[in-house]
Amino acid sequence: MAKKFQITLAQLNPTVGDLEGNYKVALEAWERAKKVGSDLIAFTELFITGYNTQDLIKKPSFFKAAQDQILQLAKACRKGPAIAIGGPAYIEDKLYNAYYILADGNIANVIMKHHLPNQNVFDEKRIFDEGEISGPYQIGPIRIGSPICEDAWHSDVSE
């Protein structure tokens, strides 16, 4: 087992709808994490799109552009720390609030948010589909779990 595993937490302030700007912020943060020897940099929920996108995420052109930014980030950051970053996922005609694990120039794993809030300013049940509970993923020798926001408050999501 590794003697150390360094994680950089990138609790930044993405701008809703500014995919290119959020990509640039993520890339700059990744470069800083690489300089300090991190093994993983973790961004927030829906970082690439900003949170909360409301109906903007349902526009096919916006969703495709968000996916393109995630793929571009994976390729640009293939030599250095892995990336955990929030973004939308569209699988089998369902739209998910997802968390992408990027490593070695590829999407290594995708975690879907399971518990969707639906109170006060949160309207996720109208926008997203509920994902299956995802288990941990592997970064080098380490198994990591990344519950997405509300998921962290429910014991059924953790292993």
Where are these regions (language model features)?
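Enzyme catalytic cores with a strong preference for nitrogen-chemistry domains
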Residues: 1-159
